[in-house]
Amino acid sequence: MGPFRVDQFPDNYPAFLAVSTSCFLRYNRWCILGIHQEIGSLTLEEGEVFRQFQKEVKKLLRCKVNFHRKCSLYEEIYKKYVYNVPEKKGESSKCVAEEEED
């Protein structure tokens, strides 16, 4: 993952999975081509928050639990690092419905 602000990531796990591959590829392409990102510099605090978020998300991706549990865990991780997340009711049930459709 590139140096992004945590609040730029999606607030739910299915959306995170959908954009993360694109995000990884875009950052790698920038590195290979030497292109500077349009994202402003992170403060020291934002960089540390991103690093901790990145560590926890990597652990989550390796975790051997069902999809519904990963949805819940991701939401907990996201709320831990993004403080102004509005409470959404029914998001976890949406994860279950998506899992059942697969």
Swiss-Prot record:
Domain of life: Viruses
Role summary: May be involved in the regulation of ssDNA versus dsDNA levels.
Protein name: Protein V2
